[in-house]
From Swiss-Prot:
UniProt pathway: Amine and polyamine biosynthesis; ectoine biosynthesis; L-ectoine from L-aspartate 4-semialdehyde: step 1/3
Modified residues (N6-(pyridoxal phosphate)lysine): K268
Family named by the database record: Belongs to the class-III pyridoxal-phosphate-dependent aminotransferase family.
Cofactor(s) annotated in UniProt: pyridoxal 5'-phosphate
Keywords: Aminotransferase, Pyridoxal phosphate, Transferase
Disulphide connectivity of cysteines: none
Gene Ontology molecular function: any one: diaminobutyrate-pyruvate transaminase activity
InterPro entries assigned: Aminotrans_3, Aminotrans_3_PPA_site, Dat, Ectoine_EctB, PyrdxlP-dep_Trfase, PyrdxlP-dep_Trfase_major, PyrdxlP-dep_Trfase_small
Key word Transferase present: yes
Name under which the protein is recorded: Diaminobutyrate--2-oxoglutarate transaminase
């Protein structure tokens, strides 16, 4: 262990986690690459857990931010009116919302994903006058009490230290037995007065569950869930903190399903540059907040408004979205071939778009593959309740050449774990 790393062992809490998976001291990053203090280069298939969809230190965003700081632009403003916030709101409306025929009010609840989830739950309860929320198995929504209450992971929930109440967990699409119609099961509870389940204020879900195992809901499942919500006057909250901002191939992860959620939670890559920013979008008729009823010191991050506005300009060019879709096809073709070529993995391809991975029934395999990949210069994490999925999450801007290099490292890592000497895929 080097001297720098020993500082973290001595002074930082045991709660730290990613530095255990990636034991290096990083000093520099650009695009989809990172370098450690020894000069070792890594291809980044992690992208800040989805906070760096545009890569590290994007030139357009960096220049806009440097110019703003050099001009003594305001940094902290709570929810006061500033030019950067006005520019961001206008760009979001013109480039993202209007073209998709989405009419949403924008709320800045605080700097992180859990802030937007907390505000969404709070608003849903305020609007409906109901207390209960329906969440789904393997969902992950944050680490504060409200968002943790709608999270499925047992180890995360255990950290709360108190009962997590006013939430009913229902089975996600294809949970357990893939033949079971989980929404028919859910609706039975809503319809039957003897079920013991009250009509909730809202349902909250990810269209692709990130931390829960890269579980992608089918489009027809999402459409049916929206119909159920409308039938029972339940608000539908889509948590797009990780699955949004192009990660699944479109700006919002729900676009392909053709649904219109009542409330949308955004964070991570909405700031563009990796700077903290969160938004809660909701239909105008739900905007019944009293001034200051929900607030937070760091909800006016002007540096993030600057980079977020620059990031949205990518979406003005249709070729950007097309490139995401083209590279997504390559990712899924590679994963499919890998599963077919190495049956010893007992694996299956999971996810959608740039939110993909392989789930393996071989105990510990995913973690071992990720560790071998790191040794070979690729940063990749695991997901799922048992860490049974190794997860591909490269920046959307990655070059085809380095995407292929990443694929080669992953296959080498799979071979190393399985003890296969020669590559099987070509």
């Amino acid at each position: 262990m080097n001297e720098t790393m020993s500082i973290f062992n001595e002074l930082e809490s045991e709660v730290r986690s990613y530095c255990r998976s990636f034991p290096a001291v990083f000093t520099k990053a650009k695009g989809w690459k990172m370098w450690d203090e020894d000069g070792t280069e890594y291809i980044d298939f992690f992208a800040g857990a989805g906070a760096l969809n545009y890569g590290h230190n994007d030139e357009k965003m960096k220049r806009a931010l440097i110019d703003y700081i050099a001009d003594d632009g305001i940094t902290h403003s709570l929810d006061m009116a500033t030019k950067p916030k006005a520019a961001f709101l206008k760009k979001l409306n013109e480039v993202i919302l209007k073209p998709r025929k989405l009419n949403y009010k924008v709320m800045f609840p605080g700097p992180t994903g859990t802030n937007t989830v907390e505000s969404a739950l709070k608003l849903a309860r305020k609007v409906t006058g109901r207390t209960e929320i329906i969440s789904f198995t393997n969902g992950f929504h944050g680490m504060t009490i409200g968002s943790l209450s709608v999270t499925g992971n047992a180890s995360k929930r255990k950290g709360a230290g108190i009962p997590l109440t006013n939430v009913v967990t229902m089975p996600y699409d294809k949970f357990g037995d893939e033949e079971v119609d989980t929404l028919r099961y859910l609706e039975q509870f809503l319809h039957d007065n003897g079920s013991g389940v009250d009509i909730p204020a809202a349902v909250i879900l990810e269209t692709v569950q990130g931390e829960g195992g890269i579980n992608a809901a089918r489009m027809e499942w999402l459409q049916q869930l929206e119909r159920i919500c409308k039938k029972y006057d339940i608000l539908m909250i889509i948590d797009d903190v990780q699955a949004g901002i192009g990660r699944t191939g479109t700006f919002f992860s729900f676009e392909e399903a053709g649904i219109t959620p009542d409330i949308v939670c955004l964070s991570k890559s909405i700031g563009g540059y990796g700077l903290p920013l969160a938004l809660t979008l909701f239909k105008p008729e739900l905007d019944i907040w009293a001034p200051g009823e929900h607030n937070g010191t760091f909800r006016g991050n002007n540096h993030a408004f600057i980079t977020a506005t620059a990031a949205l300009s990518y979406w003005e060019d249709p070729s950007f979205e097309q490139a995401i879709k083209d590279k997504s096809k390559k990712i899924h073709a590679f994963l499919t071939k890998l599963v077919d070529s190495y049956p010893e993995m007992d694996g299956c391809v999971k996810g959608r778009g740039f939110m993909a991975g392989i789930g393996s029934k071989v105990d510990g395999l995913a973690g071992k593959v990720a560790a071998e990949a790191f040794k070979r210069g690729l940063i990749m994490e695991t997901a799922g309740p048992e860490d049974e999925v190794f997860k591909l999450f490269p920046p959307l801007t990655i070059s085809d050449e380095d995407l292929e290099k990443g694929f080669a490292i992953i296959e080498e890592s799979v071979r190393a774990v399985l003890g296969v000497k020669e590559p099987v895929t070509t």
